[in-house]
Regions:
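Basic, low-complexity intrinsically disordered segments
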Residues: 2-5, 9-11, 20, 28-137, ...
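Short acidic (Asp/Glu) and glycine-rich catalytic loops that position anionic groups and cofactors
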Residues: 8-13, 41-45, 106-108, 194, ...
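Hydrophobic alpha-helical scaffolding
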Residues: 16, 20, 114, 118, ...
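Structural motif
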Residues: 52-60, 208, 333-342
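Hydrophobic, well-ordered secondary-structure elements that form the walls
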Residues: 65, 80, 104, 217, ...
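Polybasic low-complexity intrinsically disordered regions
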Residues: 85, 94-272, 285, 349
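A short, flexible helix-boundary coil/loop motif
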Residues: 328-329, 355-367
Length: 367
């Protein structure tokens, strides 16, 4: 018998959002981890928000929504609010009931900036790492470090002289053609009128110069989790300076090792690491003038070879962040907002990896 093409809605329903989410959905273990970390931030949230006045967006729901934006590559807050209107999975993860009203996108953005002001993402990052440490997933001795370029939300046409002496572009219109042939353009004399914190930089002679930031992460070598992340202005010294800054945040004065690529093979970086009781397992750059700063006393050991193998796993976080987390080109302006988004992306990458590792452990225990 042919069914009728009609829809008859009931006035009441007894189905819960929980019933729509499959029991084996990958967001289920991630949501449990997120909720455990957010519970420990209750004291911070109590300080941030006043006891009286109009209720804001719950910070816990705000953080969950921002994580969804990373997990599902949602390109804007406007699009995120639109999807939360009809996506039951999004509503379940954030904690909105079916009949709850979705927030206005501009209100959501203003509340997001409050998290930036009080460094909530940094605190959330710390709590997620504390959960990983309790599960025995973190190494306290062996680390890897690397950096990547994050293209700024600004064009070359916005890169103008600081003194305002640029000639007006020929032609008319908002996006007139520009010709910089023969003109010397540097960060000392020019800056972007769109994003003044971005810098014109290229990572190699073969690549073009772009307006960008540099993102840096410190990864522990046991489970491949990011234990430190920071965004800096892009220049030739930022990678090594940020690596030392991240190493200084590792607790304890015990001996450690850090793996890195050839860009870190400088005498200053190697000496600074050793002064911190950190053995630099840096890839040797014998083609550098003056030779490599790493000699055979370091590179002959099996631990050095192991660090060189494991350090390449750091690219998995950058790859995930650029294809899923939208850090290939940021949509935010200003180094503080870019730094917040970069840290949130690395937290999301950690959560997916932690959920997968813990699932494998449970599966192995059952077998």
């Amino acid at each position: 018998m042919r069914g009728m093409d009609e829809m008859q809605e009931t006035l009441f329903t007894t189905v819960k959002l929980e019933d729509f989410v499959p029991a084996d959905h990958p967001l289920r273990p991630i949501r449990l981890l997120v909720n455990q970390a957010l519970k420990r931030l209750n004291g911070l949230f109590s300080v941030i928000y006043a006891d009286s006045g109009r209720a804001s967006i719950a910070p816990e729901k705000l953080v969950r929504a921002l994580l969804l934006q990373v997990f599902y590559s949602v390109r804007s807050e406007r699009m995120l609010m639109e999807q939360m209107q009809y996506n039951l999975l999004f509503r379940w993860f954030v904690g909105l009931a079916i009949e709850d009203t979705v927030w206005n996108h501009s209100v959501f953005s203003k509340n997001r900036d409050r998290l930036l002001e009080h460094e909530v993402v940094e605190s959330f990052f710390t709590e997620v790492m504390r959960l990983a440490d309790k599960q025995g997933l973190l190494s306290r001795e062996h680390f890897s470090v690397d950096g990547t370029l994050i293209q700024a939300w600004a064009s070359h046409k916005s890169f103008r002289r600081k003194d305002g002496s640029d000639d007006p572009p020929p032609g008319s219109g908002r996006n007139a053609e520009a010709d910089w042939k023969g003109e010397r353009r540097s960060n000392e004399t020019h800056e972007s009128s769109t994003d003044a914190d971005s810098r014109l930089y290229k990572k190699s002679k073969q690549s073009p110069a772009i307006l960008c930031y540099q993102g840096h992460i410190l990864m522990e070598n046991r489970s491949g989790l990011v234990v430190g992340a920071v965004v800096s202005h892009a220049d030739g010294f930022a990678e090594r300076a940020s690596a030392l800054r991240l190493l200084d945040c590792v607790p304890g004065t015990h001996a450690k090792t850090v793996g890195a690529d050839k860009a870190y093979d400088t005498h200053d970086f190697v000496n600074d690491c050793r002064a911190r009781n950190v053995t630099p397992h840096v890839a040797r750059n014998d083609a550098r003038p003056g030779g490599s700063a790493i000699d055979d006393r370091t590179s002959r050991h099996a631990g050095y070879q192991m660090s060189q193998i494991i350090r390449k796993r750091i690219e998995e976080h950058f790859g995930w962040g650029k294809t899923v987390g939208r850090i290939r080109q940021t949509v935010y302006r200003g180094i503080k907002r870019v730094d917040q988004h970069f840290k949130l992306t690395m937290v999301a990458s950690n959560l997916t990896r932690m959920a997968r590792i813990m699932d494998e452990v449970l599966t192995g225990a059952v077998q």
